[in-house]
Regions:
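Residue-level signature of transmembrane alpha-helical cores of multipass secondary-active transporters
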Residues: 12, 115, 141, 212, ...
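Alpha-helical transmembrane segments of multi-pass membrane transporters/permeases
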Residues: 52, 131-154, 168, 172-175
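Generic alpha-helical transmembrane segments of integral inner-membrane proteins
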Residues: 17, 53-65, 120, 124, ...
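Helix-terminus/linker motif at the lipid-water interface of multi-pass membrane proteins
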Residues: 1, 71-78, 92-99, 158-164, ...
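Interfacial/gating helices of multi-pass transporter permease domains
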Residues: 1-12, 103-107, 167-168, 209-216, ...
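Short alpha-helical transmembrane segments in multi-pass integral membrane proteins
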Residues: 29-118, 162-218
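Small-residue-rich hydrophobic transmembrane alpha-helices
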Residues: 3-60, 122-141, 251-267
């Protein structure tokens, strides 16, 4: 549970990068369609698509090859956590805490690795679900997210308990859920979409186009990214609390997951 809490903010940061291209591209596509600038729509969608792929590729490299540098940032570095154990704790209690922190580091490492392997579909799913909204296909976006969520819910117990994969099963289920969501968006793109493109010939950098996407995409990404950074910071602070660190981090992880439900109605 704690490993998932440690790694979830990283996953949300990936989603924020998807929003950078998705929400920015969505708004720009809507304006361009209204102005009947169809050639610009092709350029916007191509840039957003391949931009998301590129960022996802960088995230894959960072999370699979550089995970050892990321662990301290998310509060899962065993040596740092062990150093914060109170000197009043000794014997079996100390050994148990050391083992718990070592397990936490390994589980978080495994979870982040799987998230890294699935970084491209994660970022691209977030981007594409927003891009199709730009064409007015909000239902397609909604169904895609629902399919991804349901797939994740179904596969979690199968991977975690049925296949005895543990925390890596939770990560694998999350990645497969993102693939399912992306699959819905791509199905719409291939079968019914007439405007969104992903052709290389349309991704030549143009400052006006990039500025139009980032003008809306960057604020959207920052809003979600700052929330994840806040959670990372809180986990680091809790990590200094010695033997109380794990229960504090676990409790905050649960709160972080259910907290968005409390204001969902405000988005309606």
């Amino acid at each position: 549970m704690n490993a998932v809490s440690m790694a979830t903010p990283v996953f949300m940061i990936l989603m924020a990068f998807g929003n950078l291209f998705g929400i920015g591209g969505c708004a720009f596509i809507s304006r361009s369609l209204g102005a009947r600038e169809y050639e610009r729509v092709k350029k916007i969608s191509s840039f957003s698509f391949w931009g998301a792929v590129f960022v996802g590729l960088l995230a894959t490299l960072a999370l699979t090859l550089g995970v050892s540098w990321i662990l301290p940032l998310v509060g899962a570095d065993a040596s740092a956590n062990i150093a914060n154990i109170s000197k009043d704790i000794s014997g079996d209690a100390y050994d148990k805490l050391v083992q718990n922190y070592q397990n936490l580091e390994q589980y978080t490492r495994d979870y982040l690795f799987y998230i890294g392997v699935g970084a491209i579909p994660t970022v691209l799913s977030s981007a594409m679900s927003n891009l199709v909204k730009g064409e007015g296909a909000a239902k397609v976006s909604m169904f895609g997210m629902m399919i991804g969520a349901v797939t994740n819910i179904i596969l979690d117990p199968i991977f975690i308990f049925g296949l005895d994969m543990g925390v890596t099963g939770a990560a694998a289920a999350t990645v497969v859920g993102q693939l399912a969501s992306l699959g819905m968006a791509m199905l719409f793109h291939y079968r019914w979409d007439k405007e969104i493109r992903r052709d290389w010939k349309h991704i030549r950098p143009q400052w006006g186009l990039i500025r139009g996407i980032y003008a809306i995409g960057i604020p959207a990404a920052i809003m979600q990214g700052l929330l994840s950074v806040m959670v990372l910071f809180v986990n680091l602070v809790f990590g200094t609390q010695g033997d109380m660190a794990e229960p504090l981090q676990a409790a905050y992880g649960i709160y972080y997951k259910i907290q968005p439900v409390s204001y969902t109605h405000l988005r309606l």
